[in-house]
């Protein structure tokens, strides 16, 4: 079912490392990351702009949008 799929995806990506493929700017709003073989819409959990190719960590998921922060 769709709910089981969403739970599986959540388990796979939460806390995971992703590569930014489209500049993340919450004001526009734009942003995408690549993780686990798929590209996802993304927003910055801190509000900072994150440039393409930066590595980020997935903090939370709302619907099909990932909230990320830059890796240290």
Stretches found by the model and what they are:
Residues 10-72:
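Terminal membrane-proximal soluble interaction domains of membrane-associated proteins
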Residues 1-13:
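Short boundary/loop segments of OB/S1/cold-shock single-stranded nucleic-acid-binding domains
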């Amino acid at each position: 079912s769709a709910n089981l799929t969403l739970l599986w995806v959540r388990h796979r990506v939460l806390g995971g490392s992703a590569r930014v493929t489209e500049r993340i700017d919450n004001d526009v709003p734009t942003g995408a990351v690549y993780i686990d073989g798929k590209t996802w819409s993304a927003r910055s959990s801190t509000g900072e702009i994150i440039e393409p190719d930066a590595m980020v960590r997935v903090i939370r998921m709302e619907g099909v949008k990932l909230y990320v922060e830059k890796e240290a």
